[in-house]
Amino acid sequence: MVVGNLAILVPSLLLQHFAGPAAPAVAASVRDVAHLAAVDTDVWRGAAPTSLEGYRSLAAAGVTTVVDLRAEPDRRFDDEMLQSFGLRMVSLPIRDGQTPTRAQTDAFLRAVDSSRGTVFLHCGAGVGRTGSMAAAYLVATGQMSGVRATLRNLSVGPPSLEQIAFTIRLQTDRAEQANMLVVAASRMLDAPRRILTTLL
């Protein structure tokens, strides 16, 4: 039992140590948003809010722009309703398990620059696509190297192999997609999870 716990605890502590300083704290009043964390003072990340109250509490905490990375449609909440909370909605669809293009990364940077308040970045679970975009943002703004941003992402949850290869290779002047062998292996290994998510 102790050995099993140490096998989980030691890598977690190492990730926290090497990932660098903790992200700034986020508002404790935000509800119904899993994996909520600050990327920096301007950007928060997390899972898609599961209720209207989640969006309302994000707005009350100072979020003015919501960037949705999901390629799969979410018909539970319409943009007009969310805009009534003072939220500007930006859609940059990325398929589950995949990574942002350079154009999507640039569009995200523009969304952050033009926001009047905090930007909330999310995908479905707030792990892979969100982590890839958050890493691209941190590297593009000179706050972290690709390796450090990858380590921070790993402390949130397990992204796909393709997403790890993308974030670890990030540099300030470019965001390269992983090579085709990594992409093929990643998508094959990640397919059962994506299929299960679609069915549930």
Regions from the language model: what does each represent?
Residues 130:
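Ser/Thr-glycine-rich phosphate-binding loops at phosphate-binding pockets of nucleotides
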Residues 2-47, 87:
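Mobile, glycine- and charge-enriched loop segments
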Residues 126:
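Conserved G/P- and acidic residue-centered "switch" motifs that form tight phosphate/ATP-binding loops
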Residues 123:
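Short cysteine clusters
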Residues 1-22, 106-118, 133-200:
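PTP/DSP superfamily signal
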Residues 40-118, 139-153, 163:
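Cysteine-based protein phosphatase catalytic domain of the PTP/DSP
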